[in-house]
């Protein structure tokens, strides 16, 4: 395969590529630190809201597009199956609205893509449930419509966003905005880390994840890894 002209480094220019690794990883780390220092109280409040919904029999719905759809599925799975193998707890009811290709394509074809998540919230959401929207721009219309519907029908709303927060910032009861206006990847890296921290906090708030709890639940569980 012919290498494209205009590449700044050849295949053997190891030092240039190592700089890319350092620049990318260090920028991502600095961005996460900025988000953590500016939003720790909000993240705790998000986790407390999710834990409260679970404890009262409600469920968490999650939606997003593209990489954010993958993050929605990732986080929903860790709520329902488990987050860390050292913490033993019941399944927690989280549903990613991004997994049913038949529902998504039917909604896009029959109602328009902007309505796909709203329709699924209408189907699965109930007053007292919680909707988490993920959007690196803050302006994904399908997510905007879903949060708007949820707010009007007795659900609480959360959002993990990027840029300046966009339209979704005003629709979420609680939101964290990653202050990055470039490519979506840096924002998504923060979002998945935030999601992991939130799951950890929810488990702690619900009484799971403590040393005492782990000792009581050790028998009968195999330690598995991905």
UniProtKB/Swiss-Prot annotation:
It is an enzyme of class 5 (isomerase). Its EC number is 5.3.1.28. Residues 50-212 form the SIS domain. Substrate binds at residues 65-67, 78, 109-110, 135-137, 140, 188. Gene3D superfamilies: Glucose-6-phosphate isomerase like protein, domain 1. InterPro entries: GmhA/DiaA, Phosphoheptose_Isoase, SIS_dom, SIS_dom_sf, SIS_GmhA/DiaA_subfam. Pfam families: SIS_2. Coiled coil: none annotated. Binds 1 zinc ion per subunit. CDD domains: SIS_GmhA (cd05006). GO terms for cellular component: cytoplasm. Its main location: cytoplasm. Keywords: Carbohydrate metabolism, Cytoplasm, Isomerase, Metal-binding, Zinc. Transmembrane segments: none annotated. Its cofactor is Zn(2+). Belongs to the SIS family. GmhA subfamily. Catalyzes the isomerization of sedoheptulose 7-phosphate in D-glycero-D-manno-heptose 7-phosphate. This is Phosphoheptose isomerase. It comes from Chlorobium phaeobacteroides (strain DSM 266 / SMG 266 / 2430).
């Amino acid at each position: 395969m012919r290498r494209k002209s205009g590449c700044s480094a050849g295949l053997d220019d190891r030092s240039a590529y190592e700089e890319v690794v350092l620049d990318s990883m260090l920028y991502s780390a600095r961005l996460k630190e900025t988000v953590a220092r500016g939003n720790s109280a909000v993240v705790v409040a998000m986790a407390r809201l999710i834990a409260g919904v679970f404890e009262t029999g409600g469920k968490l719905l999650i939606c997003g597009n593209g990489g954010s759809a993958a993050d929605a599925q990732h986080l929903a799975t860790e709520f329902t199956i488990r987050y860390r193998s050292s913490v033993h707890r019941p399944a927690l009811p989280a549903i990613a609205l991004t997994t049913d290709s038949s529902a998504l394509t039917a909604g896009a074809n029959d109602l328009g893509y902007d309505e796909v998540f709203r329709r699924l919230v209408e189907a699965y959401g109930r007053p007292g449930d919680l909707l988490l929207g993920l959007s690196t721009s803050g302006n994904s219309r399908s997510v905007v419509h879903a949060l708007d519907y949820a707010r009007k029908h007795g659900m609480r709303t959360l959002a993990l966003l990027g840029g300046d927060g966009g339209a979704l910032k005003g629709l979420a009861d609680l939101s964290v905005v990653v202050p990055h206006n470039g490519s979506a990847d840096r924002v998504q890296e923060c979002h998945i880390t935030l999601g992991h921290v939130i799951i950890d906090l929810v488990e702690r708030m619900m009484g799971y994840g403590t040393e005492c709890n782990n000792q009581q639940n050790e028998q009968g569980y195999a330690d598995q890894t991905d």
